[in-house]
UniProtKB/Swiss-Prot annotation:
Enzyme class: oxidoreductase
Protein role: Catalyzes the NAD-dependent reduction of succinylglutamate semialdehyde into succinylglutamate.
Entry EC no(s): 1.2.1.71
CDD domains tied to this protein: ALDH_SGSD_AstD (cd07095)
Family: Belongs to the aldehyde dehydrogenase family. AstD subfamily.
Organism: Pseudoalteromonas translucida (strain TAC 125)
Binding site for NAD(+): 223-228
The reaction(s) this protein catalyses: N-succinyl-L-glutamate 5-semialdehyde + NAD(+) + H2O = N-succinyl-L-glutamate + NADH + 2 H(+)
Name of the featured protein: N-succinylglutamate 5-semialdehyde dehydrogenase 1
Entry keyword set: Arginine metabolism, NAD, Oxidoreductase
Length: 489
């Protein structure tokens, strides 16, 4: 029998739907089993959140912040357990998941600052009375979390939503339910009132029931572009509901004149292969100049890529890359590599899959001669190389995508960067830094098929509350001068 994995109105209960499980993707051992939440249980979660809303929203910001800070204390106290749980379900090495657990704590202070600076009260004097701007919570919001950062990314929606006074229904990825369960238990220990956060676990049917529920006032999503587009279509014609989408990318990294080729190779690897290529900001396309300088960089990159250590999350000698999220995801990367070869690509470093596991080795594939390159996000460690003669040509080809999440330039030329910054279409643009690097205090998100709004702890404040403009006077009073045509005795 599976265990209670649904958290509704402050109570843990067993799902009434189909059974699902999560595995350690390194070996396919089952580490979590539960039954999905049904549409009726999703409805109960929405009702609980609605019932809890006014009491939570009526608390002062200081009172809400006190509970959120208690959650931060729980995160610190249980950081190693959280890091291990994330590693078990995602396959990422512990050095990475420990960083993720720490980032969850960091978002608390950033979210506090954001609320005060972006959604606080503003008063302006008027000849009679005052003009006020205040912010109010939307109400009941659904948060959909991804599998690649199952703690950190949902946290970037949930914390600012709660601080603003919303109540939440959290639907995590079905691939990382154990992380979600642990996170909710830490919220429970922090003293969060019943109904303020509700957890509904399950697969597609559970997610559809939540996304389609008429009782939610908004939906905050981090995940694939495909699912995000489905949600956007589903929400069409509902302008009264706030929809925040952070989706994928087909991200370019361009190299021009650089002196330190060793540093360039390092930043390319960090951009393309960290988290086994399962960051939405990972470099998918590498643009190298033709000629000897580009040749040297490519040769060094090939050598360094072949030397990347891939291994288990808990190896004493920590690997750079762990497992991908599943054997199916890993097999999908082999399929993508083969499809590119059929289009005319040349494999420079073969991506290889250890069958029945999520392990793959990183791959590099030369794609310059593919005339009609597919605009697909291959979510894994497969880097496509394009050679160029002209910088503007490279930028044009980098922009030839429906996505627009992250982009980067490695160059010793400030003029090149200024030109690149003006021309490139992306929400995150880095210079001489890996393009996977981002700050929770900065806007995180893109344009086009990469989404709307900015899902980070700081800028999330913008979509977690709406502004209310008021003109106010403490007592009803006649104006000093009446409008023309008025006479009031």
């Amino acid at each position: 029998m599976t265990h209670p994995a649904q958290f509704i109105n402050g109570q843990w209960s067993q799902g009434q739907g189909t059974e699902f499980s999560s595995v350690n993707p390194a070996n396919n051992n089952v580490i979590f089993q539960a039954n999905s939440a049904t549409a009726e249980q999703v409805d109960a979660a929405v009702s609980a959140a609605r019932e809890a809303f006014y009491a939570w929203a009526d608390k002062t910001f200081a009172e809400r912040l006190e509970i959120v800070k208690a959650f931060a204390a729980q995160l610190k106290e249980n950081s190693e357990e959280l890091a291990i749980t994330i590693a078990q379900e995602t396959g990422k090495p512990l050095w990475e998941t420990r960083t993720e657990a720490g980032a969850m704590v960091g978002k608390i202070a950033i979210s506090e600052k954001a609320f005060l600076e972006r959604t606080g009260d503003v008063e302006n004097a008027m000849p009679l009375g005052r003009a006020m701007i205040r912010h109010k919570p939307h109400g009941v919001v659904a948060v959909f979390g991804p599998y690649n950062f199952p703690g950190h990314l949902p946290n970037g929606h949930i914390v600012p939503a709660l601080l603003a006074g919303n109540t939440v229904i959290f639907k995590p990825s079905e691939l990382t339910p154990k992380v979600a369960e642990l996170t909710l238990k830490l919220w429970e220990k922090a003293g969060l009132p019943a109904g303020v956060i509700n957890l509904v676990q399950g697969e597609v049917a559970t997610g559809k029931a939540l996304a389609a529920h008429k009782g939610i006032d908004g939906l905050f999503f981090t995940g694939s572009s495909r699912t995000g587009h489905i949600l956007h279509e589903q929400f069409a014609g509902q302008p009264g509901k706030i929809l925040a989408l952070e989706m994928g990318g087909n991200n370019p990294l361009i190299i021009t004149d650089v002196e330190d080729t060793k540093a360039v190779v390092h930043d390319i690897i960090q951009s393309a292969f960290i988290s086994s290529g399962q960051r939405c900001t990972c470099a998918r396309k590498l643009f190298l100049p033709t000629g000897s300088k580009g040749d040297v960089i490519l040769e060094r990159l090939i050598t360094a890529t072949k030397a990347i250590k891939v291994g288990n999350y808990d190896d004493a000698d920590q690997p750079f890359m762990g497992s991908m999220i599943s054997s199916a995801a890993a097999a999908g990367m082999v399929k993508a590599q083969n499809e590119l070869v059929e289009l005319g690509a040349q494999v420079l470093v073969e991506l290889e899959h250890t069958v029945n596991t999520g392990f793959v080795t990183p791959g590099i594939i030369e794609c310059t001669n593919i005339s009609d390159f597919p605009d697909e996000e291959h979510f894994g460690p497969l880097l496509k190389v394009f050679r160029f003669d002209d910088f503007d040509q490279a930028i044009d080809k980098a922009n030839d995508t429906s996505f627009g999440l992250s982009a980067g330039l490695l160059s010793d030329s400030a003029a090149d960067y200024e030109h690149f910054l003006r021309r490139i279409r992306a929400g995150i643009v880095n210079w001489n830094r890996p393009i996977t690097g981002a700050s929770s205090a900065a806007p995180f998100g893109g344009i086009g098929a990469s989404g709307n709004h900015r899902a980070s702890a700081y800028y999330a404040a913008d979509y977690c509350a709406y502004p209310v403009a008021s003109v106010e006077l403490e007592k009803v009073a006649m104006p000093a001068t009446l409008s023309p045509g008025l006479k009031i005795d």
